[in-house]
Amino acid sequence: MNLILFGPPAAGKGTQAKRLVEQRGMVQLSTGDMLRAAIASGSELGQKVKGVLDRGELVTDEIVIALIEDRLPEAEAAGGAIFDGFPRTVPQAQALDAMLARRGQKIDSVLRLKVDEPALIERISKRFAEQGRPDDNPEVFVTRLAAYNAQTAPLLPYYREQGKLTELDGMASVETVAGSIDAALSVVA
């Protein structure tokens, strides 16, 4: 099974993906984690990515798609992938569909975690205070949220038209959201 966890920064995608990895043995393909690993490597690509993220901008499709494609064999071996933070644009979604189709696979479900903006700001402020991630500082977060809203909004109709989109209340407790995800996936499986 291949699924996409969709939602704004701080919606809880990473938390839920980690739970699904533990319970279902799937591989989490988090573009955020992959980009942070590239930065930590100190490579030329990592330095380029750092500059983009520090400004709160989105990394180019080419870079993100290459990172994802490199990890697909691992997901296939595990029996499925959880795409966290990808795709963010319709061209990325189309590229993902094409990548999976070449492997005889598809996206089975898209789960959107809906969270109100004030709650996102509260969550990101707490995470910034606890973890100090540069892309979580309040000024950069506002830019990230605006980019998310502007660039990812067209994905909703893209997946809704395919009958793959399920919208879930991301404002609920971690456990309640987990139950909603399990219920949504039981219909697909």
UniProtKB/Swiss-Prot annotation:
Pathway: Purine metabolism; AMP biosynthesis via salvage pathway; AMP from ADP: step 1/1. It is found in: Cytoplasm. Keywords: ATP-binding, Cytoplasm, Kinase, Nucleotide biosynthesis, Nucleotide-binding, Transferase. One of its GO terms (molecular function) is adenylate kinase activity. Residues 126-136 are annotated as: LID. Its EC number is 2.7.4.3. Belongs to the adenylate kinase family. Consists of three domains, a large central CORE domain and two small peripheral domains, NMPbind and LID, which undergo movements during catalysis. The LID domain closes over the site of phosphoryl transfer upon ATP binding. Assembling and dissambling the active center during each catalytic cycle provides an effective means to prevent ATP hydrolysis. This is Adenylate kinase. It comes from Caulobacter sp. (strain K31).
